[in-house]
Amino acid sequence: MLELKNLTVKRGDLTVADHINVRFEEGKVYTVLGPNGTGKSSMLKTIFGELPHEGMITYQGKQLERTKLADWRKPIGYMPQDSRVDASLTALEVVLLGRMDSLTMRVSDELLTEAASIMTQLGIGHLAHRDILNLSGGQRQMVMFAQVLLREPQILMLDEPV
């Protein structure tokens, strides 16, 4: 379970989320709705550990503030609404960034097969070798979604998904 207790997020002097209390149960799908500028994206970024906050965020009994950020993020698949990627990469390379060994930049055959399979399941397998910048905005979002799925997250947080 992911729980937010008395969560407040500020951007400068502006409070974008104020005293949020909510529990997200495992196995359920939740949608956060509201007008533009009401703190939905800020809440997701805060859960992912990108924004400072007041209050408490816990997942399976672990508190964000007391957990190494890299360990906190492992079970979370977060897709921001404005993903930026290296323009020189193909769609498949972008997907692989989700699990590539950052020290060696090597990819196993098994991982390559898994990435290609996810892309095919999402209906974008035919785009694997196209440059990411030559894809439509919607196709790029699907590539980013494939990248998130390749990480096999326990929690999916999608900000403005297609």
Language-model features: where?
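Helix-to-loop junction immediately C-terminal to a conserved catalytic motif
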Residues: 48
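A short, proline-enriched helix->beta-strand linker immediately N-terminal to the Walker B motif
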Residues: 150-154
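Conserved ABC ATPase signature
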Residues: 131-135, 139
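The feature captures the beta-strand-to-loop junction immediately N-terminal to the Walker
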Residues: 33-35
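Hydrophobic anchor residue at the start of the ABC signature
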Residues: 145
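Conserved structural motif at the start of ABC-family nucleotide-binding domains
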Residues: 2, 16-19
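Conserved ABC transporter NBD signature motif
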Residues: 53-64
